[in-house]
Amino acid sequence: TMGMKLGIVTNGDHDLQMNKLRLLNFDGFVDEIVISGDVGVQKPDTKPFEVMSEKLGLPPSELLYVGDNPLNDVEGSRKAGYTPVWVKTIGNWCFEDIERCEYEVDTVAEIPEIVRKINKIP
């Protein structure tokens, strides 16, 4: 994680989403998890992102949000003050009424390069 905090903001039921995360073996890699079912509203509402910011103890302006859904992830995180990164996965739709991202990637393997660019690390 390049010495940075890592959080997951996800829509859905608490138990279902936690089971998914356990199956993906995220234990030890993630600092905080926010599940919309616990917050009472789903992304793209800004509340789940605000809760994550509070849990991490960082202002949204210092947070990068990586997601594959143009509305829930890109637009939701942008409205909450995060810097969004869109992962252009197969099956995603185009941005129609949503402003394009400054950062767009084809795979999550490109994220460290974006982090270095944002933080001006060679």
Regions found by a protein language model. Give the residues of each.
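Short, acidic loop-to-helix structural element flanking the phosphoryl-transfer center
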Residues: T1-L6, T46
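Asp-based, Mg2+/Mn2+-dependent phosphohydrolase catalytic module
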Residues: V9-P122
